[in-house]
């Protein structure tokens, strides 16, 4: 029969078959298609891993799973991406407000691009000509020309933008908000929002997402923060959300609960997801319960994911990537400082790679492991850890209905120098949180053997090495300088500073000293608390109306404000939430004066406080 076909026809049939095979083959891997703490080069030869605690990026040869080099990049690197099909890297250095371009083969710095603040996720176009970087604060996408190494466009992305991914055709960017899990699609050419998938009011902590290369689906992990449920079996839940990118009505977004997904195994704190090259497998890492889940992606628009298998990965897994040949899945255990190489078929171990040495003291390291753990002895029912509400020491952007009343989650920055702790100053040492560990919220066994001293009573410090380690980690967080004062205080901020320190406004009578707080760890009968008129508007309040004075440093990024979170802007602190001038005398201020005062507050800190001068040692009580 073949004799009846001409050579031209045979060539056409051959070309058709080649095209058909290519269309049915796994989607070609593109390095940097979604943000992560890890990335794999397009040719599958190198892996790069961002080490947040070490301030480094480690380059690994995937031919033999050996470390080639560890490159110093700066404070708290987050996202890392190979640039196009090259072996050059882009690193989002979160703590230094820059994107660093480095050569993976020799570790040399190619260039650095300064950005406004907090670069988190970074992805590269397939041709390597452009980088797109999310700025956690103030919620922007920065486009960078890799040839000139300069920013060429800034796109407003929504508050606290973290996760970022390129669509399969390279025409869209998908971005997720950290505190809402809202996903937006941006048309790259115009920079405008092309589509949006909102999360529910309880969705929280969505830091990364991936796009299916073959199906119109996006996948992101997040938690639900149910602020009206202050107990360990109802407040925090793990999810994977699956937005449908096809046009249509309704939410076009499904949620897959992870606490019942793995054959009834409760998990906590999903951190990242990874997808294989042909879009048929999804991998999820859980930083609280130290697990890796593997799931089949279903083409059913209903279940979306079907559990395949799981393993215990290691301490605090934060990243997962799949090799371009779909043979190996890599998991980054952040607090083991290791990357695991696992077979995709059965998740058996191929190699364990030490990517950095532990840069933390042994005490802080142990405390950090406990802080992120949703396992005994910290937690009894696995759903929650300290980091569920205080990720990396930052607030979760929520106001919780706690037993004592409404409480807005506070930052840990500077906490070592601003004791006592809590809005009500009801804990004078971090070790007092043994009561939280054993209480309804965490339902853990606890870290002290035997009885616990009451809060504000005798010290719990020294009763447990683990509890002291937890305190050491909690007290290790420092401030970042405000991006609003990088060039010094603006004229408006200077005018606001004059108002703030004026005798008439009276702000500095409470917000004093290097940390702008009069909070001190005194004996219970001498604790300094103030009634600022905000403690009588909630019928559930049990401990007001006087509250501890919070530091104002870093205030620009910790909204909503006040103990009950009812000030949605800083201006509202002085307008809607300052009855009878009890929280500073501001009723006489004009609108432009309030604006200047806000500019000053946003500029804090414009220099680092001096803790040696400010620190007050804890009062020893009998």
Predicted regions and their residues:
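Bacterial N-terminal signal peptides that target proteins for export
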Residues: 2-16
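Predominantly soluble domains enriched in secretory-pathway, periplasmic, or organellar proteins
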Residues: 18-20, 24-374
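Periplasmic c-type cytochrome electron-transfer domains
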Residues: 205-232, 236-239, 243-622
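Polar helix-capping/helix-linker motif
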Residues: 6-7, 25, 373, 502
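A general, composition-driven signal for non-globular sequence regions
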Residues: 1, 5-6, 21, 39, ...
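Intrinsically disordered and other compositionally biased segments
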Residues: 10-13, 23, 412
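Prokaryotic Sec-type signal peptides and long signal-anchor helices
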Residues: 9, 20-22, 604
């Amino acid at each position: 029969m073949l004799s009846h076909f001409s050579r031209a026809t045979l060539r056409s049939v051959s070309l058709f078959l080649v095209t058909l095979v290519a269309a049915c083959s796994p989607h070609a891997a593109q390095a940097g298609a979604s943000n992560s703490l890890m990335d794999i080069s397009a040719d599958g030869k190198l892996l790069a891993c961002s080490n947040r605690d070490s301030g480094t990026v480690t380059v690994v040869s995937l031919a033999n799973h050996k470390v080639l080099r560890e490159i110093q990049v700066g404070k708290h690197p987050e996202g890392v991406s190979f640039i196009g099909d090259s072996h050059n890297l882009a690193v989002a250095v979160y703590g230094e407000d820059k994107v660093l371009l480095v050569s993976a083969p020799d570790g040399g710095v190619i260039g650095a691009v300064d950005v406004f603040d907090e670069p988190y996720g970074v992805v590269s176009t397939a041709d390597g000509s452009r980088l797109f970087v999310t700025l956690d604060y103030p919620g922007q996408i920065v486009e960078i020309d890799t040839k000139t190494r300069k920013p060429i466009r800034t796109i407003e992305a929504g508050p606290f933008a973290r996760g970022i991914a390129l669509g399969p055709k390279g025409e869209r960017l998908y971005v997720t908000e950290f505190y809402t899990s809202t996903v937006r699609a941006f048309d790259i050419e115009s920079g405008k929002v092309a589509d949006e998938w909102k999360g529910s009011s309880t969705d929280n902590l969505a830091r990364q997402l991936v796009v299916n290369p073959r199906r119109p689906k996006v996948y992101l992990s997040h938690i639900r923060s149910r602020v009206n449920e202050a107990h360990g079996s109802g407040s925090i839940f793990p999810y994977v959300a699956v937005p449908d990118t096809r046009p249509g009505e309704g939410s076009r977004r499904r949620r897959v609960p992870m606490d019942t997904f793995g054959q009834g195994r409760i998990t906590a704190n999903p951190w990242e997801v990874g997808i294989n090259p042909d879009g048929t497998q999804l991998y999820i890492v859980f930083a609280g319960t130290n697990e890796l889940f593997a799931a089949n992606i279903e083409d059913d628009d209903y279940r979306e994911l079907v559990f395949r298998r799981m393993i215990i990965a290691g301490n605090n897994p934060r990243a997962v990537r799949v090799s371009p040949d779909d043979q190996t899945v890599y998991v980054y255990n952040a607090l083991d400082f290791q990357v695991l190489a696992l077979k995709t078929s059965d998740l058996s171990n191929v190699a364990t790679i030490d990517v950095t040495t532990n840069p933390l003291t042994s005490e802080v390291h142990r405390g950090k492991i406990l802080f992120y753990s949703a396992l005994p002895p910290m937690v009894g029912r696995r759903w929650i850890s300290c980091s569920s509400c205080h990720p990396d020491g930052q607030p979760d952007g929520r106001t919780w209905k706690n037993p004592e009343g409404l409480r807005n989650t506070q930052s840990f920055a500077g906490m070592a120098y601003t004791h006592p702790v809590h809005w009500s100053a009801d804990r004078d040492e971090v070790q007092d949180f043994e009561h939280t560990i054993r209480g309804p919220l965490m339902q853990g066994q606890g870290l002290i053997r035997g009885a616990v001293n009451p809060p504000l009573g005798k010290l719990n410090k020294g009763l447990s090495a683990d509890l002291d380690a937890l305190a050491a980690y909690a007290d290790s967080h420092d401030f970042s300088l405000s991006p609003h004062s990088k060039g010094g205080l603006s004229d408006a901020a200077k005018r606001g500073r004059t108002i703030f320190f004026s005798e008439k406004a009276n702000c500095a009578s409470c917000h004093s000293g290097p940390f702008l707080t009069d909070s001190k760890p005194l004996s219970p009968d001498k604790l300094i608390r103030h009634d600022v008129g905000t403690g009588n508007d909630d019928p559930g309040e049990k401990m007001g109306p006087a509250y501890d004075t919070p530091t104002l440093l870093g205030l620009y990024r910790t909204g909503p404000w006040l103990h009950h979170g009812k000030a949605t802007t800083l201006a509202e602190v002085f307008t809607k939430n300052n009855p009878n001038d009890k929280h500073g005398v501001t009723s006489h201020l004009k609108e432009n004066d309030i604006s200047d005062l806000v500019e000053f507050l946003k500029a804090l800190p414009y220099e680092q406080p001096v803790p040696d001068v400010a620190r007050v040692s804890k009062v020893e009580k009998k």
